[in-house]
Amino acid sequence: PEALLSRANLAVDTLDRYSQRLDEVLQTLTILEMRDSATVRDVATVMQRMEMIRRITSEITEYLEELGSEGRLLALQVEDLIRGSASERALVMRDYIRDPADVARVEAELTSLGSERIVDLTAIANILGLDVYEVADLDREIMPRGVRALSLVPHLSWNAIKAVSAHFTTLPQLRAASVADIEVIDSVGHYRAQLIVENLAHQAQAVGAGVVGW
């Protein structure tokens, strides 16, 4: 058990480092999205980090199952480190995968990607359907749908998020929309439209993006 506990502790340390790195690249992506300058590379890097976290978490789960009650403290640590990561992963995917019906396929392909290919951002970008044919394509700018940004708006249902992101299709279009533009969408209305406009402006201000990006 001591050797197993030692391996589990090392894996949790790795998870901690991965989580910190994910926070950094996710924050960078958020800033770039609000400045309308996110690239395929930025998105692929975030997905790469998320997949690495999923893999190390899966490994730790196996250790914890073997450790039983002796792994309880580690289990709490892991829970704390990965809190919200699954929903964040789903939101990033829905922002950049063209067809939401492809999410399950993308998940499966990322999971089956060999450990030697998880470092290949081109492979990850192509799994996401972002059409990378050469390394230079990784630096192509790409627009999110705004799903993740909308998820931060209080009192907004998932149905409303889907309806709004389907209506405007990109975050820049959504940020340029007025309350009148948004309130006509099904399941939104005036109050929620106002919340969306105010919250998106606040998000942009929080990352220093201003209302019109750069």
Spans of features found by a protein language model:
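Short, exposed interaction patches on small structured surface elements
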Residues: 1-19
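General structural signal for secondary-structure boundaries
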Residues: 2-3, 39, 120, 178
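Long, highly charged, low-complexity intrinsically disordered interaction regions
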Residues: 16-17, 21-30, 47-50, 58-185, ...
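Charged heptad-repeat coiled-coil "stalk" segments of single-pass membrane proteins
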Residues: 41-47
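Phosphate-binding and adjacent anionic-ligand microenvironments
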Residues: 54
